[in-house]
Amino acid sequence: MPFGNYKTAISARATDKEILKKAQDGGYVSAAHIYGLESKLLDGVSVAADTEDGCNAAPKVATTPEEVLNAAGAKYTVSPNVSVLKDAVREYALEKVGIVGTPCQVQAIRKLIKYPMGFRHTDSRIVMGIFCMENFSYEGMKAIVEEYAGIRMDDVLKTDIGKGKFWVYSKYGDVKSVKLKDTHMYEQKSCHICTDYTAELADISTGSVGSPDGWSTIFIRTEKGEAYINKMVEAGVLETKNIDDVKPGLDLVQKLSLQKKEKNEKEIVQRRELGLPVPY
């Protein structure tokens, strides 16, 4: 299956206007984490927080709604969110942890959960995955933003990917775009051997593709994920639509997912023939 196993798919957005102002697309991840903290379902969450270095991101343990909101928005540079899970346990003494990550990070988390030692003294209460085609190093991002878009890293407000382009928004209202074909040389090499676009091992996966502007596409994959979404809807913090009732719908998600699988499976075969490391 191009999306992996899932129970249902929906289009959704947060009902909180402050979240929608700050968050990317429908603001689902921020809304889910804030709801979890306020309802005591979660003690803390691992997030990719903003830094002072323009588009760069760094992993952080967020324990308040304010910290979650400050970390809102898509990040296209690598943020090793899994690395702060030890901090969540040892430094913050958290027991109910929410985790969000890219497909490769979700795979690592699932392996950690199944490892005999597991998350010692900690319950990975919910694992959320982000749709991801590829990611960039900070140096690669800097080249895209400054050399192609002509905007200083310190002046970047946010970045986004859509309609075949990489978009850069400055703090001063400038909006520049870069053709995606010009960004490929700056992609992380490890992204070229990943065949997972929709975070297939998460409890809940989300991304903008498939939904209208301002909404998020969500794959509910597990009973744990289904229960979490239902609680959010009942609490009035999330509004949803049937994915079949929106455009462009799952056809576009399927197209991109299959593109990633087919392209990167060929790369894996080529690397194996050359004796280079491959994931399987």
Curated annotation (Swiss-Prot):
The keyword Metal-binding applies. Keywords: Iron, Iron-sulfur, Metal-binding, Oxidoreductase. One of its GO terms (molecular function) is flavin adenine dinucleotide binding. Its EC number is 1.12.98.1. Pfam families: FrhB_FdhB_C (PF04432), FrhB_FdhB_N (PF04422). PANTHER family: 7-HYDROXYMETHYL CHLOROPHYLL A REDUCTASE, CHLOROPLASTIC, FORMATE DEHYDROGENASE SUBUNIT BETA. Reduces the physiological low-potential two-electron acceptor coenzyme F420, and the artificial one-electron acceptor methylviologen. This is Coenzyme F420 hydrogenase subunit beta. It comes from Methanococcus voltae.
